[in-house]
Amino acid sequence: MKKTALYSWHEEAGAKIIDFGGYLMPVQYRGIIAEHHAVRSAAGLFDVSHMGNFYVRGARAKEFLQYMTTNDLDNAEDGQAQYNLMLYPHGGIVDDLIIYRIDSETFFLIVNASNAQKDFEWLQQHIAAFEGVVLEDHTDQLSLIALQGPLALNILATVFPALDVPALGAFRFCKVLFQGTEVMIAGTGYTGEKGVEICLPNAMALPLWEALFEAGKESGIQPIGLGARDTLRLEMGYSLYGHEIDQDTNPLEARLKWVVKMGKGHFMGKEACQQVEGNLKRGVAGFSLDGRVLPRQHFKLYNSDRQEIGWVCSGTLSPTLQEPVGTCNVVREYLKPGTPILVEVRGSLHTGVIRRLPFVTTSLS
């Protein structure tokens, strides 16, 4: 089992540690609900160093990534990040990822922890056709810290006074020095709040973590575990691999058509997406349940005639709304917000309704 460079800090802080993606990671400190509210109201600090990260380099690096992913990197400038997908030929999703364009021949990729080895092998499997392109795995050398919340950028400015924080912007990134070491700061996140994700060498993770905590002390900054990270992303309707998206789900079914650029050249899985386009049979939507029962992944959904129409992708008790919410994969006719549904929970059917995503408004709304 791997440990991040911040593992000892989490342990000393009394975090509950679990195995996640082959890493020993903090799932909670004070409690998921308290941590969730801290991010929505002030600021939270996340250790997400378990995420996989790769460099793709070479004169044909962009050409290679254009073929391997669905979004259009011609729309990304140097210093810009782009949400993206890798597909199998049949249209199922290999993974979702963020690609950072450092320059025309250098790209940095952040992928899901549980898929890192699979993703690396998938990319490596297809790289030979693009002569001179090199794929490097830097996962074990780098740490990733997320600072998120309405007050996050104020805290960031305290630690990096020379950084032009307003100019950073969503899905923009820059490289700056921290105690003489170069770090990459990106206007990205997984919470729906203002914030950044900071990538840096392992040796500098603890000094930066402690500096951000010191700077955010008066603002109420809190350490945040993976439990609250999940409730925060679910309130926004963000996809999680293995839940809303997987190898059997086409991105057009998963509310991710905006990431699939049919107008660019050929890419892996394009034909499968073209076949589905205009002929969707299913889709992913939000829903809420009456009462206090918790919907969990794989629970079945029914229409008012008790015909099975889908399943739960993710579910939780929303700390913000104080009601059970989730995402579901349902037959197309039931995707409209306001449509009544039934969800089977431990053998009983509970009433609910399809909801528009996201469930909440945030500091970025």
Curated annotation (Swiss-Prot):
This is Aminomethyltransferase. Belongs to the GcvT family. It comes from the Bacteria. The glycine cleavage system is composed of four proteins: P, T, L and H. Its EC number is 2.1.2.10. InterPro entries: GCS_T, GCS_T_bac, GCST_C, GCV_T_N, GcvT/YgfZ/DmdA, GcvT/YgfZ_C, TrmE/GcvT_dom1. It comes from Pelodictyon phaeoclathratiforme (strain DSM 5477 / BU-1). GO terms for biological process: glycine decarboxylation via glycine cleavage system. The glycine cleavage system catalyzes the degradation of glycine. Pfam families: GCV_T (PF01571), GCV_T_C (PF08669). Disulfide bonds: none annotated. It catalyses: N(6)-[(R)-S(8)-aminomethyldihydrolipoyl]-L-lysyl-[protein] + (6S)-5,6,7,8-tetrahydrofolate = N(6)-[(R)-dihydrolipoyl]-L-lysyl-[protein] + (6R)-5,10-methylene-5,6,7,8-tetrahydrofolate + NH4(+). Keywords: Aminotransferase, Transferase. It is an enzyme of class 2 (transferase). The gene is gcvT. GO terms for molecular function: aminomethyltransferase activity; transaminase activity. One of its GO terms (cellular component) is cytosol.
